[in-house]
């Protein structure tokens, strides 16, 4: 979530509603004015609450800038303090506007509940927000274009990922498909969760349909999911080719699979990272961990190919990461 940009859009949209008729050029100028001084346009509990949340998230990220310099015990203690401060910020945001959906979402995620308890909490948040009936595609046919609908999309994304983590693969797929239907642009990444769920369900037809929909937009989730799916179906020659494609798509993809690295909580949604970069590979492997755990020989099979092992080891040497 780009909180600062969304705060600008929220404030500008509410101010346009008060002004009445405003041309596109006029709205663009209004957005520039809001960006110069957002605080001057925060004129309701709704916007004040969102601004408080954005500040809390910014503080959480700034406080973790030097985490790499800490030893394990220091890191755990510092991270616990940061999460507690973030939770306090969410509580403050909710005291300003109890309807701030993003604050409720972040509060649940920051509690680091297990997948079952987290899903219960997220579904409770959704229920309190009025359920899916309130989600509108708007005039453009994409809910993402309405900045006030984005919190609901982020909530659905978190529900889908939590379902995947908790081995509720059909529910993860259903919610992900709902996300893609509500927002075809899919900024939240429902297609990514769907790819992994389809792989675990061994739904080759559904996976191929998703692949066709994303034609020309390859990503690490899709390529890793394809490799797992074909491996589970026992087509080993095709699985080997898919593994090679996965390894060649993203920088450090082999290392990410063979030596999984720590991934911080998504607060509140999956961070945007450069396509084809190492972070994309680490995110995909992290989200696929519950599926990979169900296929215990998959990683050792991948590691058995000298070219794949060498790619991972080479990336380790280039970056200085542990091997």
Where are these regions (language model features)?
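Residue-level recognition of tetratricopeptide repeat
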Residues: 48, 86, 93-103, 169, ...
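Residue at a conserved register position within TPR or TPR-like alpha-solenoid repeats
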Residues: 59, 107-111, 163, 198, ...
């Amino acid at each position: 979530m780009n909180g600062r940009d969304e705060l600008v859009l929220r404030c500008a949209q509410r101010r346009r509603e008060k002004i009445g008729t405003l041309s596109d050029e006029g709205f663009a100028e209004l957005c520039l004015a809001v960006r110069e001084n957002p605080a001057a346009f925060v004129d309701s509990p709704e916007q004040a609450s969102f601004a408080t949340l954005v500040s809390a998230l910014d503080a959480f990220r700034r406080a973790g800038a030097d985490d790499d310099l800490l030893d394990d015990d220091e890191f755990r203690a510092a991270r616990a303090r940061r999460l507690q401060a973030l939770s306090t910020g969410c509580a403050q945001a909710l005291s300003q506007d109890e309807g701030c959906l993003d604050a409720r979402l972040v509060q649940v995620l920051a509690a680091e509940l297990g997948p079952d308890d987290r899903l219960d909490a997220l579904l409770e948040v959704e229920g309190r927000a009025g359920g899916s009936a309130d989600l509108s595609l708007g005039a453009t046919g994409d809910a993402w274009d309405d900045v006030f609908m984005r919190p609901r999309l982020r909530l659905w994304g978190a529900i889908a990922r939590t379902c995947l983590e908790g081995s509720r693969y059909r529910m993860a797929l259903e919610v992900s498909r709902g996300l893609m239907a509500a927002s075809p642009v899919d900024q939240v990444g429902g297609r990514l969760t769907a790819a992994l769920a389809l792989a675990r369900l061994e739904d080759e037809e559904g996976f191929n349909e998703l692949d066709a929909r994303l034609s020309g937009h390859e990503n690490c989730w899709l390529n890793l999911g394809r490799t797992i799916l074909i491996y589970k179906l026992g087509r080993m020659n095709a699985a080997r080719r898919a593994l090679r494609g996965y390894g060649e798509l993203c920088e450090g993809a082999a290392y990410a699979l063979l030596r999984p690295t720590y991934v911080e909580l998504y607060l509140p949604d999956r961070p945007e990272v450069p396509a084809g970069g190492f972070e994309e590979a680490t995110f995909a492997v992290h989200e696929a961990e519950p599926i990979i755990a169900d296929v215990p020989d998959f990683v050792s099979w991948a590691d058995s190919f000298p070219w794949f092992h060498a790619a991972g080891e080479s990336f380790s040497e280039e970056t200085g990461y542990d091997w």
